Amino acid sequence: MSKRKLNVALIGYQFMGKAHSNAYRQVARFFDDLEVEPVLKVICGRNEENVRKAAQKYGWEEYDTSWERVVERKDIDLVDVSVPGNMHAPIAIAAANAGKMVLCEKPLANTLAEARQMYEAVQKNKVPNALCHNYRFAPAVQLAKQLIDEGRIGKIYHFRG
């Protein structure tokens, strides 16, 4: 059975961009019954030399340095927002207003007001949207939570996640 192609634009190429690139390439190995096949269309970042290298290294067809240009592309179905949190709202809102599906890395927004604007944009435009919490259900994270809840590692004074 032929799978529907899902043309992906990834905004951000550094740590989370690398993780998301890998996930798109590996998803079919983990889920046999996917109805769609992600197509790595374009990766976007501010530094042209670095984003060009990322496109080659991670298997993207193209690269761009303007997220504004990318979200307006007619051939893009999904915009994956994997940049620092201060840029999530403007990119996600523009993508929703352009009729694109929106996948946003955590944190959703820097403020409640930004989060509400993002919510309103995806609702108004009736676009599918999701927030990534990649490691919430990872076995190591679940075990750490269990050990903390059971008090088995003592009092927590500092946590970085």
Task: Give the ranges of each region predicted by the language model.
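Conserved G/P- and acidic residue-centered "switch" motifs that form tight phosphate/ATP-binding loops
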Residues: G12, K106, G151
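Beta-loop-alpha module in the N-terminal Rossmann-like domain of NAD(P)-dependent dehydrogenases
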Residues: N47-E49, Y58-A121
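Short loop/turn motifs at secondary-structure junctions
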Residues: E37-V39, G59, D75, R152-K155
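A contiguous active-site-proximal alpha/beta segment in oxidoreductase catalytic domains
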Residues: A109-G161
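Receiver (REC) domain switch-region micro-motif
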Residues: I43, V79, F159
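Structural signature of beta-strand start/N-cap positions in the alpha/beta core
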Residues: N7, V39, D75-L78, K100-M101, ...
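Alpha-helical structural signal in soluble globular domains
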Residues: A23, V27-F30, K57, I93-A94, ...
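N-terminal Rossmann-like dinucleotide-binding module
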Residues: M1-Y58
